[in-house]
Amino acid sequence: MDVTGMLPVERPYRGKISISREHIRRKHLVKKRVVFTLKGICLIVLLFAALFPVYWLVLMAIRPTAETSMGAGLIPHQITGEHFTELFVGKGFGTALKNSLINAVSALVMSLVLGLATAYIISRKRFRFGMKKPLTYWVLLVRVLPPVAFVIPLYTLFTKWNLMGTRLPIILSCMLVNIPLVIWFMVSFFEELPEEVEESGKVDGATEWQLFTRLVLPLVLPGVAAISMLSFMYAWNEYTYSVILTRSPANYTIPLALAVLNTEDNVTNFGLVAAGGVSSFLPVALFVVFAQNYLISGLSSGAVKE
């Protein structure tokens, strides 16, 4: 008798190992929560790094001088407006604000008038030998070079024209720097517009000026708003030209006034300087907050496409 025929034979297991779908879903959910938490922590750290200097500046501006010198903590024990009162009443900081506003707005308007017209002509004119793109980059070169490279020629020119001692040197210098940026930025916006828009206007009998002001400009307003904010902020914060081309304290701008506050009487009043900093960035911050949608849409839709 064959004994081996009576023994049980082991057969290989042919089934599939099943994993619960609920277990997979929970594992994926936990992973998703961990990633979300890490992103939130990184965002909080970045926000803290970006906003803490602003918070500290405001804190120093509203603290009394005695509390500021004691090196108090993150929460003020007393809030005062003495620094702002001394800034505007005793130091005449309002004059610097007015000068900066006049200079920035004047330079902005002149830059837009000349820059938009030039950008429109470059975008619509057919250049030989593919010179359009090199031309736009050569124009931008004026913006890329450091301001110090133009100071001596501009100083000589403005002195010859008897403009020193007025606001015009600062306005014209800021305009010189902003126009290339306006041209380079807006060329891409005009190139994205189909020429059929202007052809339809010509059929209706519109002039070149009417085509530009009534048809083309309304379609590129996000770009105009974005470049306006960038140009305004540059002119508002401009220091190099101001410190060399400004002679009279009556024409001081905000950067110059803040520099004087830092060095006046050989003693720095940190609360006073902080109040000047808050007063200088607050108008621009409010302007950017209210117009940030135009800035984002303008920067995104006007990106240069190769």
Describe these PLM feature segments.
Residues M1-V35, T68-G90:
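Membrane-topology segments of multi-pass transport proteins
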Residues F36-E306:
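A structural signal for multi-pass alpha-helical bundles of membrane permease subunits
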